[in-house]
From Swiss-Prot:
Cofactor(s) essential for the protein: FAD
GO cellular component annotations of the record: plasma membrane
InterPro entries for the chain: FAD/NAD-bd_sf, GMC_OxRdtase, GMC_OxRdtase_N, GMC_OxRtase_C
Gene3D superfamilies in the cross-refs: FAD/NAD(P)-binding domain (3.50.50.60), Glucose Oxidase, domain 3 (3.30.560.10)
Ranges that cross the membrane: none
GO molecular function: alkan-1-ol dehydrogenase (acceptor) activity; flavin adenine dinucleotide binding
Chain's gene name: alkJ
Stated name of the protein: Alcohol dehydrogenase [acceptor]
Coiled coil region boundaries: none
NCBIfam families: PRK02106.1
Catalytic EC class: oxidoreductase
UniProt keywords, alphabetically: Cell inner membrane, Cell membrane, FAD, Flavoprotein, Membrane, Oxidoreductase
SUPFAM superfamilies: FAD-linked reductases, C-terminal domain, FAD/NAD(P)-binding domain
EC identifiers of the protein: 1.1.99.-
Biological source species: Pseudomonas putida (Arthrobacter siderocapsulatus)
Length: 552
């Protein structure tokens, strides 16, 4: 029997396994549906280009047909290995905007506000450039670094942004977010530094930590609304793990799988569970609701030179040099995360904060990397940072081996399409600036014929895709309608918590890996210190005596 059963070894689960097993008197079990993270493509940064096609390492979900995207069903990759999506993502280290966490504080109290989050980000971080910065940490396990080998086109993009009257920002996680610049990444010595590498690998042999991979969780076991274990399937065999009398089940499967597992276990909207013949354990209607994600549209251009990372016979000599440089020195273009530079901008000057994010790629990227785009070109990803549209996760069936229903409901709020139109126009202005214009051969998409707002809207509806940041489906809050309380305990149940991106009340303005890791660190302290709702003050959140002194 275990004191803690953690379901999901992703960005959050690896942190929890590390922190909760630090007490040798506590037995911890970590269940992961995917395999161990031994595939070399995980650890070689440019391997990201091939991971979308890996069914072994990727859930490879498909959404429901999207009403406002021409009824298209969108591809939703999610990590399925130790490290979860931090093992297949673009490694971009972004915390979000301070105002994001002010909204979290309104929802869940002081323990989830910016002051607390900022201290935890610094505690977790081992930044290899900002060693004397007030905004970064150097003693944590999560390695954060500059890219080792920037493509010249990425530098040209930043210069062109400045020529287009966008200020340079040397640190998107510093004093302010707005501007163009180069992304820092979760890498160490030219290799991906996933949550598994940062928090799990060094403690994997702890005698009180059992890691069970290729274990597909099928149900949380309850006795009188108390979680007592988890059922899973491994190699076609049905298995169970149980908790001690005071033990806990912690769900860290992410914004898609966590609500699915809750519903399969009898926790969710009673009507939906009845529809699928699932016995009700607890009627919790908000499970799976409040789904938020960043929708993305691309500008793609052909280049007039061989400067980009190309797919062509002429690239073979450069590719071989890069391969040997990576093998022997951990340098060269294979250390690229592809999304090397970018920025945060406002769709209109009167806004008080950025609502658009750019990821610039010095290469072609087609269909999430699943299709090969031959030649030399470059791509700008443009996403709506603060979407107003809300969707849901539901069930397709009561079979735990079936994928859930994923309905992001993209562009259901008309404000979102207006933001994306502005993003296309700003992106084109950057590409028209001298430093990028000198590389330009032709615009591939949307294409030179797409100029009016109506034409841009039609293009967005026909091409927009996810940029992989789903959150919010087990919303945290002080209000009784929320799925989890500020201690991340599932409302109406005992001995079960949710700790992953699904608890976010609102989507952060940026990439979600770093905030998810921070959530897990905060949750671990809540659990270890036995903070409960009795520790809350109705007006200010957690009492100060429950905070670590160095985090005040």
């Amino acid at each position: 029997m275990y004191d803690y059963i953690i379901v999901g070894a992703g960005s959050a689960g690896c942190v929890l396994a590390n922190r909760l097993s630090a007490d040798p008197s506590k037995r911890v079990c970590l269940l992961e549906a995917g395999p161990r993270d031994t595939n070399p493509l995980i650890h070689m940064p440019l391997g990201i280009a091939l991971l979308s096609n890996s069914k072994k390492l990727n859930w490879a979900f498909q959404t429901a047909p999207q009403q406002h995207l021409n009824e298209r069903s969108l591809f939703w990759p999610r990590g399925k290995t130790l490290g979860g999506s931090s093992s297949i993502n673009a490694m971009v280290y972004i915390r979000g905007h301070e105002e994001d966490y002010q909204a979290w504080e309104q929802a869940g109290g002081e323990y989830w506000g910016w002051k607390r989050a900022f201290a935890l980000f610094k505690k977790l971080e081992h930044n290899q450039r900002f060693d004397k910065s007030n905004y970064h940490g150097t003693d944590g396990e999560l390695a954060v670094s500059d890219l080792k080998d920037l493509n010249p086109l990425s530098k040209s993009f930043v210069q062109a942004g400045m020529e287009a009257k966008i200020s340079f920002n040397g640190d998107f996680n510093g004093a302010h977010q707005e501007g163009v610049g180069f992304y820092q990444v979760t890498q160490k010595h030219g290799q991906r530094w996933s949550s598994a590498r940062a928090f799990l690998h060094d403690v994997i042999d702890r005698p009180n930590l059992d890691i069970i991979t290729e274990a597909h969780a099928t149900k949380v076991l309850f006795e009188d609304r108390k979680a007592v274990g988890v059922s899973y399937i491994q190699k076609n065999m049905h298995q169970q793990v149980k908790t001690t009398d005071s033990g806990e089940v912690i769900l860290s499967l992410g914004a898609v799988n966590t609500p699915q597992l809750l519903m399969l276990s009898g926790v969710g909207a009673a009507a939906e569970l009845k529809e699928h013949g699932i016995a009700l354990v607890h009627d919790l209607p908000e499970v799976g609701k409040n789904l938020q994600d960043h929708l993305d549209i691309t500008l793609m251009c052909a280049a007039n030179s061989r400067t980009p990372i190309g797919v062509a016979f002429s690239f073979i000599p450069r590719g071989l040099v890069g391969l040997f440089s990576y093998i022997f020195k951990r340098k060269g273009f294979l250390t690229s995360n592809v999304a090397e530079s970018g920025g945060f901008v406002k769709s209109s000057p009167e806004r008080d904060r950025p609502n658009l994010q750019f990821h610039f790629l010095p290469t072609y990227l087609k269909d999430h990397g699943r299709k090969i785009a031959v030649g030399y070109g470059y791509t700008l990803h443009i996403c709506d940072l603060l979407p107003k549209s809300r969707g849901r996760i539901g069930l397709k069936s009561a079979n735990p081996m079936d994928d859930p229903l994923i309905d992001p409901n993209y562009l259901s709020d008309p404000e979102d399409i207006k933001t994306m139109i502005a993003g296309i126009k700003i992106g084109r202005a950057i590409f028209d600036a001298p430093s990028m214009a000198k590389h330009f051969k032709r615009e591939i998409v949307p294409g030179p014929a797409v100029t009016s707002d109506d034409e841009i809207v039609a293009d967005i509806r026909s091409r927009a895709e996810t940029i992989y940041h789903p959150v919010g489906t087990c919303r945290m809050g002080k209000d009784p309608a929320s799925v989890v309380d500020p201690c991340l305990q599932v409302r109406g149940l005992r001995n079960i918590r949710v700790v992953d991106a699904s608890i976010m009340p609102n989507l952060v303005a940026g990439n979600t890996n770093a905030p998810t890791i921070m959530i897990a660190e905060n949750a671990a302290e809540i659990i270890v210190r036995k903070v409960d709702m009795a520790s809350l003050d109705a007006s200010i959140g957690f009492t100060r005596q429950n905070l670590e002194p160095e985090l005040l």
